[in-house]
């Protein structure tokens, strides 16, 4: 999402807004942004996630529960739209508190979709990019297209990575420059427990994993797997 969409490849010094910064996607995004020499602004939903995101290297954190501008865009020209617009501007000022007055984000790392898309498309800077890979809050994304054409913004879909990008990400992991932020690992028989935690939003910050034919955790290479299997 952050690389491969020329000319909007992430560059040192740029600012990126990351939705769901304490989750699986967001925690990786913040670390990748750091490796590129750019600045991550993480958005969280609970204050107890702030330290986790800051420890990942975010330049700043915003709690979305401090604002009321989520969901589908109200009809343009209505009182509801005016209220939404005022709240979005307040959210933008919270970003400026981190980036500096008048400095909007160059890129938005978007995956909630319906709940956040109107804010993403408004908040990204002139000539910037909103890149989206999912719609975890819904697929009916709305936005005020006037801000799109008048400020020449870009909407970009992203679906995983090509082989070279995947290999580069794996190398960062093997070199321990990326932390998988593995909060919980479940044996295969506890797969339903993991699913229920996701459904009820009870999972810890970071990522969960389930062992699939793996004898134990911490196996980084094929040789590690073979050695662990021989010990069983």
Model-derived regions: residue spans:
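C-terminal hydrophobic helical "lid"/dimerization subdomain
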Residues: 118-121, 163-232
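Short, glycine/polar-rich helix-capping loops at beta-to-alpha or helix-loop-helix junctions
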Residues: 45-52, 139-145, 166
